[in-house]
């Protein structure tokens, strides 16, 4: 884990009201693994850091995917190239990839696409065939950037791809499922694919396990800290009835 001042290197739009921000952070980029996240802090700005999945890492840069859903994310989108944030990361436990699987399906809903470019690249490097299934409310909300061997789209309004849930667009016979998106979607993933790996969202304060604000209820009882034991879990290990389902996905933790 590193804490560094990370200048903004670039910004690009990838969906309606959705952007990728690239920050210069060579040490964090070199260490980041699929499914991990970084905590960003603006000065001056909100008191607490904001968690974001590592979207990509390349050329010493860490990329994050975000949409303005509050004061902190709105201020991040107002940054100009050269403006710096305090970056803490990489944090958490990410996706486990096994070359023996042969193939893997990445299933994302909305901003749940956030951790999957880095995950797809790592999976392909491990010799896995990658199928990415991405869903959103409408075509304009679908992330325009994807990686993998094939992609399937799903929209709630039927404006692109399958008319309905991304889960229903997953082709038969795919290998291990990795999923990220709203908790209601992940609860449905747990019913269909109990052994799937899911990146969960929850409230978070410190990102280092101290504040206990990111509690994830486990099905056998007790709680984990998403920033330490997560944010990636076996889907069936989470008590989805007790995990908040109303959060707007912004990061996996």
Whereabouts are the PLM-identified features?
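Ferredoxin-reductase
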Residues: 1-81
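Short Fe-S-cluster ligation motifs
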Residues: 217, 221-253
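Structural signal for conserved beta-strand scaffold positions within catalytic alpha/beta enzyme cores
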Residues: 10, 56, 153-155, 198-200, ...
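FNR/FR-type flavoprotein reductase catalytic core
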Residues: 71-203
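Short, surface-exposed secondary-structure boundary micro-motifs
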Residues: 43-44, 90, 219
């Amino acid at each position: 884990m590193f804490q560094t001042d990370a200048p903004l290197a670039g910004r690009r739009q990838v969906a309606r009201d959705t952007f990728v921000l690239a920050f210069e952070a060579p040490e964090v980029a070199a260490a980041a693994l699929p499914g991990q996240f970084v905590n960003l802090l603006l000065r001056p700005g909100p008191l607490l850091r904001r968690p974001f999945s590592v979207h990509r890492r390349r050329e010493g840069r860490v990329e994050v995917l975000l949409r303005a859903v509050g004061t902190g994310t709105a201020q991040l989108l107002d940054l100009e190239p050269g403006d710096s944030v305090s970056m803490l990361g990489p944090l958490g436990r990410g996706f486990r990839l096994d070359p023996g699987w042969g193939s893997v399906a990445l299933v994302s809903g909305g901003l749940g696409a956030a951790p999957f470019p880095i995950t797809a690249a790592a999976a392909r490097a491990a010799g896995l065939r990658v199928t990415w299934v991405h869903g959103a409310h409408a075509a304009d909300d679908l992330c325009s950037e994807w990686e993998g061997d094939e992609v399937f789209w799903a929209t709630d309004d039927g404006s692109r791809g399958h008319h309905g849930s991304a889960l229903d667009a997953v082709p038969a016979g795919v290998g291990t499922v990795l999923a990220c998106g709203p908790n209601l979607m992940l609860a449905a993933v747990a019913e269909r694919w109990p052994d799937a790996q899911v990146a969960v969202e929850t409230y978070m304060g410190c990102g280092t396990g101290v504040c206990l604000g990111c509690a994830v209820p486990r099905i056998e009882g007790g709680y984990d800290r998403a920033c330490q034991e997560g944010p990636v879990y076996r889907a069936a290990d989470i008590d989805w009835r007790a995990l908040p389902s109303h959060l707007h996905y912004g990061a996996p933790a």
